[in-house]
């Protein structure tokens, strides 16, 4: 087994875990990182999605108490039933749009320049939503007071879930960010930052699980048992880095907004576009 390949897999796993739940696009960062590392070949077509299962398991582990209670109460507790219903409703639009448009989008947009453009556009949208949120609530949302219509995920209606599910479809465009679309979209629909962030975490479980399973089944002919160590390293590092990120982000959103991520997206995306335009970096597709 090529040690350098394992190191690249570890780096990719760390990038996935640190970016999956931040509004900065894990797919975009993986595409750019793979380009810089020259991490290419048939295996990459499956690897990027497969290692997302590591991030998914981090959510399951961090919220294992809530998830265990939900499973135990699914047959007789209204709160558990509503929670599962909302997750399923929010998940369905991504399934439909992914099956209908996924191949076309992957063919035309999974390249560094479109990703960088989406980074910049997404950053501008976050700035606008944060400005709107602050105009409505001031700093009260950062001070622990109840200000939003949906203060916790238990306050959600089926319509709320559907709207969040629809905005998640925008994340099919690489560089948009699944967590960014769901968190910022939820805030636009009246969620508190914490409720938006937590629902985005939970929605990632069926979304990442479904995407990973579909990719592995569809691309199974590209895989061999010899690839297992590479995938295992990527998944483990994605799990560990995602766990750190989840715990940090929940604390962060209690007292901070998402403006810093918007400026990061704009600066990073702008730098990639500038380097591509100037020919400073050979961004490999």
UniProtKB/Swiss-Prot annotation:
The chain crosses the membrane at residues 3-23, 41-61, 87-107, 109-129, 197-217, 226-246, 260-280. GO terms for molecular function: undecaprenyl-diphosphatase activity. Keywords: Antibiotic resistance, Cell inner membrane, Cell membrane, Cell shape, Cell wall biogenesis/degradation, Hydrolase, Membrane, Peptidoglycan synthesis, Transmembrane, Transmembrane helix. Its EC number is 3.6.1.27. Pfam families: BacA. It is found in: Cell inner membrane. Coiled coil: none annotated. The keyword 4Fe-4S does not apply. The keyword Methyltransferase does not apply. InterPro entries: UppP. Catalyzes the dephosphorylation of undecaprenyl diphosphate (UPP). Confers resistance to bacitracin. Bacitracin is thought to be involved in the inhibition of peptidoglycan synthesis by sequestering undecaprenyl diphosphate, thereby reducing the pool of lipid carrier available. This is Undecaprenyl-diphosphatase. It comes from Methylibium petroleiphilum (strain ATCC BAA-1232 / LMG 22953 / PM1). The gene is uppP.
């Amino acid at each position: 087994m090529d040690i350098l390949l394992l190191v690249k897999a570890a780096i990719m796993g760390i990038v996935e875990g640190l970016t999956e739940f931040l509004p900065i696009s894990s797919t975009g960062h993986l595409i750019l990182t793979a380009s810089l590392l020259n991490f290419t070949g048939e295996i990459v077509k499956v690897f990027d999605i497969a290692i997302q299962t590591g991030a998914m398991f981090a959510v399951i582990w961090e919220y294992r108490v809530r998830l265990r209670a939900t499973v135990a109460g699914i047959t007789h507790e209204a709160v558990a039933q509503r929670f599962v219903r909302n997750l399923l409703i929010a998940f369905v639009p991504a399934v439909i749009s992914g099956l209908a448009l996924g191949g076309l989008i992957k063919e035309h947009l999974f390249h560094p320049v479109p990703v960088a453009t989406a980074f910049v556009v997404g950053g501008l949208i976050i700035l606008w939503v944060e400005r709107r949120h602050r105009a409505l609530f001031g700093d009260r949302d950062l001070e622990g007071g109840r200000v939003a219509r949906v203060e916790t995920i238990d306050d959600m209606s089926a319509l709320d879930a559907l709207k969040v599910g629809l905005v998640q479809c925008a994340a099919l465009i690489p560089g948009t960010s699944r967590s960014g679309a769901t968190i910022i979209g939820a805030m636009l629909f009246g969620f508190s930052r914490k409720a938006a962030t937590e629902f985005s975490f939970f929605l990632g479980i069926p979304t990442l699980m479904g995407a990973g399973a579909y990719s592995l089944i569809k691309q199974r002919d590209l895989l061999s048992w010899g690839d297992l160590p590479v995938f295992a390293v990527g998944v483990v590092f994605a799990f560990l880095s995602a766990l750190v990120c989840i715990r940090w982000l929940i604390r962060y959103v209690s007292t901070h907004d998402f403006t810093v991520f918007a400026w990061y997206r704009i600066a990073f995306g702008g730098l990639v576009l500038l380097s591509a335009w100037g020919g400073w970096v050979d961004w490999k597709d």
